[in-house]
């Protein structure tokens, strides 16, 4: 108060006022502070001071032709005096008002195109619904989130090239547009922005928003997709949340969601195939998500999820160095350990070989619904601080941490035998065996763990073996916290290796990911996922396998046909028949296969009844390992629509129906395509009459000398082979029959065999 009174007294003297308003500021330090560098030191003051002047704006001389000297009220809009130090004109703020009201108008057609992201945001907010506000403690954890909805996923460099090409097409500088998405976007934007009058720099900024993913590390409780993040400030505070449903979806969120589903499906499918890694790569390369190749999306999309990271590792891309266990992402924040193999005994006296981590370590554990901080020593949990959405989520985190700690009391809590297997019927490794066991039932684990009295610490409470909160006691070393644990913020990526069984390791050999870590959650993808690989036919169920298998045979009939007669074993081993085996009753697979292979062999040799439709129909059955048997079948069973349905060996059935008139095949009532060649008996031509007594083996084979004419054939001995010129001017290889009894069928067969050999 004293100071203020003193100042008031000073101000009342006229001399003080004069000193403060008239004298120059000549202290060098002050002048330096406000004049050095281009950076404005006090922008607000500068603005106020400038706007108080009559002509605070300078403009190009051309403005004098475009704006009158005075407005309707007679106020001066610009001054004839030049701006000191340049040949620009001094202009009044009133000129801006005049220009806005009376200046030239331009076409607005480009605005929604350039400012697309803003227009779309307004639409989403207009159609979004805001629910009630709830006051409660918010457990927020920092996660890396996508902050601009509606973007493509180009890298900064790719986007830069696209922007330069669209906005400054005539600038020099090498720009190589390689990826499909780059080319598509460039073409689309060039068309959209023809004759655009918006300042190029502005267009460039807006394009960047549209093309590049921008992420920030933000505290979030709830939805993390970009349409939720754009309203984060409206939906969650420190002690309140407001319910919100977005008024529209954006492609980038849909891509992320669909990518996770595709990756999970592919990893699950690859696990059960003979060579998981090769199968996984084949599927990644042949899958499209929303019309874009999955491998392109994987290269550009930073989504971190177990299955997605396994696919990235297989493609040789870098991934995050954190590892996954029990669906939680672990990041070591302190300490170190060495691995030693130890044998331990479970409560059921089963021996397990586990890799023990010796040493003190600290980890953060982050899951979808719970997070934790874990401190552990060799086979001992020292402290676990958990926070989660609900009791269930907290329990999940506690189980994972207890198993991860490798404590003896956890291993002794096992009741019964551990024999969990993965999808391919292989035993899981011991750590996952333990995890599965306790995820099924953790009662004994929690009961045996032990409890301890707890101190009263702010924001922490205890949790009892039955998962109820307590202020006095808690599971040994375990506390529940109100505060979440932040996700690992670094975006650093490391080089990893992957083995045949899809186990991903860092360069120190630590396992970061394995198929056991891939979530079993099923979801419906937002974008269409097109799996071209035959391995994924079964994703849509047995009917799809059946239809796809027959469609594949018909589409590739030309090559299948040749392999059928010349290299059947290679044909039977084709990957495309793999899925079909799951439809054939296990007990019958090898019998069916033996029967069909024998039948085919007879068609090739003696009987000569080459029947296209029958080959197509029975071929998938021949793919199983055959059992030699003399069994005959008139129909073969496949398991579809929840029961066994029959395919007739001779003739049509609801499962496999060939229409001779239209030459189209329907499988389970679905069209499976048309046969390009005529499988009917047809009319036997002249050759077939003449070739009676000869078996057509296939195409010309030079080892059997020059082609004979049909008349010269009669000189061949039984069993002798020769090339023969037939009427179409084609050469085929034939063999004179060793026995005469099958001569009758030769004439029917010859037509087809010739056709086949020629094709």
Curated annotation (Swiss-Prot):
An annotated GO BP? DNA-templated transcription
Q: What is its main location?
A: virion
Q: Which InterPro entries match?
A: Flu_PB2_2nd (IPR049110), Flu_PB2_6th (IPR049114), Flu_PB2_C (IPR049115), Flu_PB2_CAP-bd (IPR048298), Flu_PB2_middle (IPR049111), Flu_PB2_N (IPR049106), INV_PB2 (IPR001591), PB2_helical (IPR049113)
| Keywords, alphabetical | Cap snatching, Eukaryotic host gene expression shutoff by virus, Eukaryotic host transcription shutoff by virus, Host gene expression shutoff by virus, Host nucleus, Host-virus interaction, Inhibition of host RNA polymerase II by virus, mRNA capping, mRNA processing, Viral transcription, Virion
Where does the record place it?
A: Virion; Host nucleus
Task: Place the motif Nuclear localization signal on the sequence.
Answer: 736-739
Family annotation (Pfam families): Flu_PB2_1st (PF20947), Flu_PB2_2nd (PF20948), Flu_PB2_3rd (PF20949), Flu_PB2_4th (PF20950), Flu_PB2_5th (PF00604), Flu_PB2_6th (PF20951), Flu_PB2_7th (PF20952)
Name a GO molecular-function annotation: RNA-directed RNA polymerase activity
Record site feature (Avian adaptation), residues: 627
Family indicated by similarity: Belongs to the influenza viruses PB2 family.
Q: How does it assemble?
A: Influenza RNA polymerase is composed of three subunits: PB1, PB2 and PA. Interacts (via N-terminus) with PB1 (via C-terminus). Interacts with nucleoprotein NP (via N-terminus).
Function of the protein: Plays an essential role in transcription initiation and cap-stealing mechanism, in which cellular capped pre-mRNAs are used to generate primers for viral transcription. Recognizes and binds the 7-methylguanosine-containing cap of the target pre-RNA which is subsequently cleaved after 10-13 nucleotides by the viral protein PA. Plays a role in the initiation of the viral genome replication and modulates the activity of the ribonucleoprotein (RNP) complex.
Name under which the protein is recorded? Polymerase basic protein 2
The organism named in the record is Influenza A virus (strain A/Goose/Guangdong/1/1996 H5N1 genotype Gs/Gd)
- Name the gene behind this protein: PB2
């Amino acid at each position: 108060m004293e100071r203020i009174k003193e100042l008031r007294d000073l101000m009342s003297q006229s001399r003080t006022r004069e000193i403060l308003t008239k004298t120059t500021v000549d202290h060098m330090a002050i002048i330096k502070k406000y004049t050095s560098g281009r950076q404005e030191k006090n922008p607000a003051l500068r603005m106020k001071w400038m706007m108080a002047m009559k002509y605070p704006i300078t403009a190009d001389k051309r403005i004098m032709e475009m704006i009158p000297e005075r407005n309707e009220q007679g106020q001066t809009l610009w001054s004839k005096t030049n701006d000191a130090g340049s040949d620009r004109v001094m202009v009044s703020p009133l000129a801006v008002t005049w220009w806005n009201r009376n200046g030239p108008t331009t076409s607005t057609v480009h605005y929604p195109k350039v400012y697309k992201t803003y227009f779309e945001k307004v639409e989403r907010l207009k159609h979004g619904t805001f629910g009630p506000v709830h006051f409660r403690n918010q457990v927020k954890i920092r996660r890396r989130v996508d902050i601009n909805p509606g973007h493509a996923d180009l890298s900064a460099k790719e986007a830069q090239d696209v922007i330069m090409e669209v906005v400054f097409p005539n600038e020099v500088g090498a720009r190589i547009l390689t990826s499909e998405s780059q080319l598509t976007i460039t073409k689309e934007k060039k068309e959209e922005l023809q004759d655009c009058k918006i300042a190029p720099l502005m267009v460039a900024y807006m394009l960047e928003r549209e093309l590049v993913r921008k992420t920030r590390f933000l505290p979030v409780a709830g939805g993390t997709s970009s349409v939720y993040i754009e309203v984060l400030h409206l939906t969650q505070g420190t002690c309140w949340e407001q319910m919100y449903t977005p008024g529209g979806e954006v492609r980038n969120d849909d891509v992320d969601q669909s990518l996770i589903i595709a990756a999970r499906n592919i990893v699950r499918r690859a696990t059960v195939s003979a060579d998981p890694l090769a199968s996984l790569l084949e599927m990644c390369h042949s899958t499209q998500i929303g019309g874009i190749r999955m491998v392109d999306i994987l290269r550009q999309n930073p989504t971190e999820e177990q299955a997605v990271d396994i696919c990235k590792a297989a493609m040789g891309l870098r991934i995050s160095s954190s590892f996954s266990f029990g669906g939680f992402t672990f990041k070591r924040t302190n300490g170190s350990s060495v691995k030693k193999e130890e044998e331990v005994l479970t409560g059921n006296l089963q021996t397990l070989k586990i890799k023990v981590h010796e040493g003190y370590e600290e980890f953060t554990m982050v899951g979808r619904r719970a997070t934790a901080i874990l401190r552990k020593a060799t086979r001992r949990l020292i402290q676990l601080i958990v926070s989660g959405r609900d009791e269930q989520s907290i329990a999940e985190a506690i189980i994972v941490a207890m198993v991860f700690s490798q404590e003896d009391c956890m291993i002794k809590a096992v009741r019964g035998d551990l024999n969990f297997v993965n999808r391919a019927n292989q035993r899981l490794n011991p750590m996952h065996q333990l995890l599965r066991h306790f995820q099924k039932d953790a009662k004994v684990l929690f009961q045996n763990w032990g409890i301890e009295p707890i101190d009263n610490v702010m924001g922490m409470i205890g949790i009892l073996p039955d998962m109820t909160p307590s202020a006095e006691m808690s599971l040994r070393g375990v506390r529940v916290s109100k505060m979440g644990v932040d996700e690992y913020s670094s975006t650093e990526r490391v080089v990893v290796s992957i083995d045949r069984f899809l186990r991903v390791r860092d360069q120190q050999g630590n396992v970061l990911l394995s198929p056991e870590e891939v979530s079993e959650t099923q979801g419906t993808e937002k974008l269409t996922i097109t799996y071209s690989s035959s391995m994924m036919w079964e994703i849509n169920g047995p009917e799809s396998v059946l239809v796809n298998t027959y469609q594949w045979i018909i589409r590739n009939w030309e090559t299948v046909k040749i392999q059928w007669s010349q290299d059947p074993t290679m044909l039977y081993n084709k990957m495309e028949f793999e899925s079909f085996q799951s439809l054939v009753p296990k007990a019958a697979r090898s019998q069916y296969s033996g029967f069909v292979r024998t039948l085919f062999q007879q068609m090739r040799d003696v009987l000569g009844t080459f029947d296209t439709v029958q080959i197509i129909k029975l071929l998938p059955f021949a793919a199983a390992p055959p059992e030699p048997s003399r069994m005959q079948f008139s129909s073969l069973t496949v398991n579809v629509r929840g029961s066994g349905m029959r395919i007739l060996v001779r003739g049509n059935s609801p499962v496999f129906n060939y229409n001779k008139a239209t030459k189209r095949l329907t499988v389970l009532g679905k069209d499976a395509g048309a046969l390009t060649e005529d499988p009917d008996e047809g009319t036997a031509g002249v050759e077939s009459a003449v070739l009676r007594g000869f078996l057509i083996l296939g195409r010309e084979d030079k080892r059997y000398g020059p082609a004979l004419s049909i008349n010269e054939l009669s000189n061949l001995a039984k069993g002798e082979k020769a090339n023969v010129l037939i009427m179409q001017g084609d050469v085929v290889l034939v063999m004179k029959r060793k026995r005469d009894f099958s001569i009758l069928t030769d004439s029917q067969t010859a037509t087809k065999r010739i056709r086949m050999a020629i094709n």
